[in-house]
């Protein structure tokens, strides 16, 4: 009777602790994850490019795929500022451009000739900027097109012109592509002469030593011992993990000890049966030769 009551109590305690484990363990897993969203709504190709750059620079980053086909880049919260600076220096994420279909989509209203002309010039600028941005080593590009409204009755026409601004990696030999870039712009705009296209190249150079120094500075600032809530959470998570481990170990050892104590108590309560005889009866084959 005593052994049965003891077993019921142990079973009740164990079943009562199970809900606590189911709540504590997921909470600890959630707290141990300190990654935050860096950029969202990214296309897969651009997200992979950003992920590779971050990982090559020593940043622990992951890409999370969304249900809508876009991707999200997540990094450690301590390296959020460094990750933003690193990607901005490489022109990532890239600027989004509108195409001709998006600019001239039906609005239901009759546009004036001036509005249609403005849309056309803007569409040319967007398309050319997008094309030049796809060149390897180009971080960002802007194309400004000037199409003067010439009067057919006036003799002297003002020629069209275009200005191109390119921000690129200094390691890329982009000046060698300058004639091709000017030809690309001139051939894309009707009536635009080659010598009326001006291109401004701005190289961006950052030495490897400066890059490592910036990373070391951000890591030092992120890991310095300051009494911030984030540090308190990290210490609390570590303490909670240690406490839960000890708690589970204590439960296992205590349960085993209570089983052995119950077996010994039941053996001692049996009248006329020695402990050795009970053990031999409990384990068949013991003492047989």
From Swiss-Prot:
GO terms for cellular component: cell outer membrane. InterPro entries: AMP-bd_C_sf (IPR045851), FliF_N_dom (IPR006182), T3SS_SctJ (IPR003282), YscJ/FliF (IPR043427). Keywords: Cell outer membrane, Lipoprotein, Membrane, Nodulation, Palmitate, Plasmid, Signal, Transmembrane, Transmembrane helix. Gene3D superfamilies: 3.30.300.30, Hypothetical protein rpa1041. A lipid is attached at residue 34 (S-diacylglycerol cysteine). Its main location: membrane. Pfam families: YscJ_FliF (PF01514). Belongs to the YscJ lipoprotein family. This is Nodulation protein NolT. It comes from Sinorhizobium fredii (strain NBRC 101917 / NGR234). The lineage of its organism: Bacteria, Pseudomonadati, Pseudomonadota, Alphaproteobacteria, Hyphomicrobiales. The gene is nolT.
């Amino acid at each position: 009777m005593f052994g049965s009551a003891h077993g019921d109590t142990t079973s009740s305690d164990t079943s009562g602790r199970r809900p606590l484990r189911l709540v504590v363990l997921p909470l600890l897993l959630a707290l141990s994850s300190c990654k935050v969203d860096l950029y969202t709504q990214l296309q897969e190709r651009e997200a992979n490019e950003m992920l590779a750059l971050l990982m090559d620079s020593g940043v622990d980053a992951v890409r999370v795929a969304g249900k809508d086909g876009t991707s999200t880049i997540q990094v450690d919260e301590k390296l959020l500022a460094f990750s933003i600076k690193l990607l901005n220096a490489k022109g990532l994420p890239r600027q989004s451009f509108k195409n001709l279909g998006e600019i001239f989509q039906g609005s239901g209203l009759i546009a004036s000739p001036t509005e249609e002309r403005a849309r056309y010039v803007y569409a040319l600028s967007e398309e050319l900027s997008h094309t030049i941005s796809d060149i390897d080593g180009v971080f960002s590009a802007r194309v400004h097109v000037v199409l003067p409204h010439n009067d057919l009755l006036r003799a002297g026409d003002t020629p069209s012109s275009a200005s191109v601004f390119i921000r690129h990696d200094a390691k890329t030999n982009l000046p060698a592509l300058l004639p091709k870039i000017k030809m690309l712009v001139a051939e894309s705009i009707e009536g635009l002469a080659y010598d009326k296209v001006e291109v401004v190249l701005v190289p961006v150079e950052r030495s490897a030593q400066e890059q490592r120094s910036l990373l070391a500075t951000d890591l030092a600032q992120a890991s310095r011992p300051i009494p911030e809530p984030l540090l308190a959470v990290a210490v609390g998570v570590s303490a909670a993990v240690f406490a839960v481990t000890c708690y589970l170990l204590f439960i296992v050892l205590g349960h085993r000890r209570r089983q052995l104590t119950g077996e010994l108590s039941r053996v001692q309560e049996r009248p006329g049966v020695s402990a050795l005889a009970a053990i031999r009866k409990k384990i068949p084959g013991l003492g047989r030769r």
